[in-house]
Amino acid sequence: MRILYWGTPAYAVPTLRQLHQAGHTIVGVVSQPDRRRGRGQQLVASAVKQEALNLNLPVFTPERIKKDSDCQAQLAALKADASVVVAFGQILPLEVLEQPPLGCWNGHGSLLPRWRGAAPIQWSILDGDAETGVGVMAMEEGLDTGPVLLERRLSIGLQDNAHALAEKLSGLTAELMVEAMPLIEAVGAGPTDERLHRLGVQHQAEASCYARMLCKQDYQIDWSNSALAIHRQVMGLYPGAQTSWNGKRLKLTQTEPLIDRLKDQLSPEAQELVGQWPTGGHAGGTVLACIQDLGLVVSSSGCPLLIREAQLEGKSRSRGQALVQQMAAAEQQSIGDN
């Protein structure tokens, strides 16, 4: 098949690579423009653009594809059979969606219609979902509303953070998209409704949650929340959930909620700590214990939270004994502003 590929972050690289390895002709790659990053504010190409250049593929980087009629015309001239979109970062206008005769297909990083929107991986963890997955969806004008052709499910473990989960889902997306292409090609061109009917796609239910873009406030830990809610925040926003310690920013990167009903999902070391501190009696964010080989036990609403790894502003990430020493923490001190 002649495929026009749309994608931007590292998440989208495996799908491009595997479609290319499967023998499909990638007629072009569309990605977000180079952005300034880092302390030196150097222009840096997206991960997908870098991969495309490594594969000697033509690259297009429109600032806004919806308003760039010249780019739209260039892409139409490539005569792609189908478009494949994975985390591109812009909404495609109808005139672009209607170009390829075999349709535009999106690799979506969640189970639909559970999470639609910009940050489904993060919100699936934040909301405590037991499972997530990926889907290959026929694109239409609505945001993530199209019918689903294929889907794969994946359990979310208590210690799965957003980065680790994204890596798993990225690989699944690539596998699923490679599986989908022969099905799409076999059905051939024709009116959209007829093509989708022959493919046997599953139309989505109306009920869904919107995985909105994350904002600065989402990353700030509130120690009046439960240990489980804070843990999900640390995992879902990895590595960015933060609090403060003696006026400096403290990013939490690994925690364990010391909750009896979750005991079988905790590490052996954390299991031994469950139930050692009575609930209540301490303000949220109070250091209850400094355990040299594990980290800090901190109070929250209900059961306490074990901080196993964190990064203090101006320091490298540390864990266990090194973390306790770096923070010079003592019992009854307070973390955060609560």
Swiss-Prot record:
Keyword entries, A-Z: Protein biosynthesis, Transferase
Catalytically driven reaction(s): L-methionyl-tRNA(fMet) + (6R)-10-formyltetrahydrofolate = N-formyl-L-methionyl-tRNA(fMet) + (6S)-5,6,7,8-tetrahydrofolate + H(+)
Pfam family, one: Formyl_trans_C
UniProt EC number: 2.1.2.9
Source taxon at top rank: Bacteria
GO molecular function: methionyl-tRNA formyltransferase activity
Entry annotated with the keyword Cytoplasm: no
InterPro entries noted in UniProt: Fmt, Formyl_trans_C, Formyl_transf_N, Formyl_transf_N_sf, Formyl_transferase-like_C_sf, Met-tRNA-FMT_C, Met-tRNA-FMT_N
Binding residues for (6S)-5,6,7,8-tetrahydrofolate: 110-113
Family: Belongs to the Fmt family.
Protein name (database record): Methionyl-tRNA formyltransferase
Organism: Parasynechococcus marenigrum (strain WH8102)
Gene: fmt
